[in-house]
Amino acid sequence: MLWSSLIALVLVARNAEAIHTLRFACSQLVTERLDPLVNPGKNPSPHMHQIVGGNAFNTTMDPSNDIGETATCTTCTFSEDFSNYWTAVLYFRARNGTFKRVPQIANQNLAQAEGGMTVYYISPDNTTSPITAFRPGFRMLAGTAENRKPESGFVNLYRCYDSYDENMFFKPNPMGIAATDTTELPKSFCGGGIRVNTFFPTCWNGVDLDTPDHKSHVAYPDRGAPCPATHPVEIPQVFIETIWDTEKFDKSLWPEDGSQPFVFSQGDPTGYGHHADYVFGWKGDGLQKAMDARCDVYDASPEPLIFPPEGCPHLKTQSQKVANQCSQRQVAVEPLDEWLDALPGNMPITYS
């Protein structure tokens, strides 16, 4: 739904003239305070996350385990994608100082998904080398939770929707120009929700499946340039999209001064600290085959599915109804949908 407005950004970043896109839904697996990438083994972790993907998600996510082989179900459309994707959670702060979790809206043409995210894997045509799919044990982090100002080489893109209709067509038209996108949380009331897209790096050093900071083994190329010599291997452009249902929180609940009332679970009211984690978990070599074939899959249509094998014969799909049945109970058990006196974990709100 939004991908064409982001194509220019991806093209410039990857210096490509044509790209191919896998776009699919991943409904909610669980929402809880666990972060096995940044805080492995810690229960609970400092702030709340929304998690989608395979049911092998756990407190530690031991990198020696191939989660593509250990997971038994996934919330994603592609039934061989047992990867896990997670981001911070958006909260509304009312004028009386209490907080409530903002739910997600399923994406256009993916409306059967129960909240969650839309996931994109993008590969260009005119690349100097093949696109190398990730390997078991690979993981990475995009963004920095502590940021309150723009981060060099990384952006989130936000869009404020005025409304949407019964067919989940959003206004303003998400296929339009990216001029309405911002790199910080919108400051106005968004009756159709707030969309946020988070982009992962596209270059890898070809050696390390992870590094202590979960970033140094990957890199963003300079705009219009190929991958740097330090990270010469081109990997798929992964980005994830969430639409937060901000319409439920009308202006009567906003702070009396009209200031922006939304804050991410790590205490970020700016949006610059929004971040995402990725742990690879595709089964077998399906993702590599899809990259080699430059598969294009944009929509998950109502059942029966009309893409794959036509869209990408190398990948297997499942109905969204089946995907929605894959879920986990909270390990770090705490309330999700009540009004709270503080952000989960008593995370302080910081502006710098």
Located regions from the model:
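Primary mode marks residue(s) on the alpha4-beta5-alpha5 output face of response regulator receiver
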Residues: 19-45, 50-198, 205-352
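Fungal secretory targeting signals
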Residues: 1-21, 352
